Swiss-Prot record:
It is found in: Nucleus. This is Homeotic protein bicoid. GO terms for molecular function: DNA binding; RNA binding. Bicoid is polarity protein that provides positional cues for the development of head and thoracic segments. BCD regulates the expression of zygotic genes, possibly through its homeodomain, and inhibits the activity of other maternal gene products. It comes from the Eukaryota. Residues 1-29, 42-63 are annotated as: Disordered. Its main location: nucleus. Belongs to the paired homeobox family. Bicoid subfamily. It comes from Drosophila subobscura. Keywords: Developmental protein, DNA-binding, Homeobox, Nucleus, RNA-binding, Transcription, Transcription regulation. Signal peptide: none annotated. The lineage of its organism: Eukaryota, Metazoa, Ecdysozoa, Arthropoda, Hexapoda. One of its GO terms (cellular component) is nucleus.
Amino acid sequence: NLEPLKSHTVVGLDKSCDDGSSDDMSTGMRVLSGRGAFAKFGKPSAAQAQPQPPPPPLGMMHDTNQYQCTMDTIMQAYNPHRNAGGNTQFAYCFN
């Protein structure tokens, strides 16, 4: 689902963002690209073209774990009845 959307936006929208006109947005995308689903679907072609974005694999794994932590915390906040599972994952995250 995300794959065709990404290749579609890379043509125009994503390029304007990557031009460097908005550095904050670029940084945000770089942070997102190392976490969760964006690690796979977030502008891989742009990451290869620019020497800036690619993070070290170890840091990427750590960021992914960090994101998983945040995601589970958010899910716990939105689903209080899922409390026990959220707490287990939360403890596992910060081990």
